[in-house]
């Protein structure tokens, strides 16, 4: 995850 993005 990175801030509001969870790929």
UniProtKB/Swiss-Prot annotation:
<protein>
    <recommendedName>
        <fullName>A-conotoxin cyclic Mila</fullName>
    </recommendedName>
</protein>
<keyword id="KW-1213">G-protein coupled receptor impairing toxin</keyword>
<keyword id="KW-1015">Disulfide bond</keyword>
<comment type="function">
    <text>Cyclic peptide that displays a 100-fold selectivity for type-1 angiotensin II receptor AT1 (AGTR1) over AT2. Interacts at high nanomolar range affinity. Binds to the extracellular side of the receptors. Shows a competitive antagonism mode of action on AT1, blocking G-alpha (q), G-alpha (i3), G-alpha (oA), beta-arrestin 2 pathways and ERK1/2 activation.</text>
</comment>
<dbReference type="GO" id="GO:0090729">
    <property type="term" value="F:toxin activity"/>
</dbReference>
<keyword id="KW-0964">Secreted</keyword>
<feature type="disulfide bond">
    <location>
        <begin position="1"/>
        <end position="6"/>
    </location>
</feature>
<keyword id="KW-0800">Toxin</keyword>
<dbReference type="GO" id="GO:0005576">
    <property type="term" value="C:extracellular region"/>
</dbReference>
């Amino acid at each position: 995850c990175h801030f509001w993005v969870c790929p």
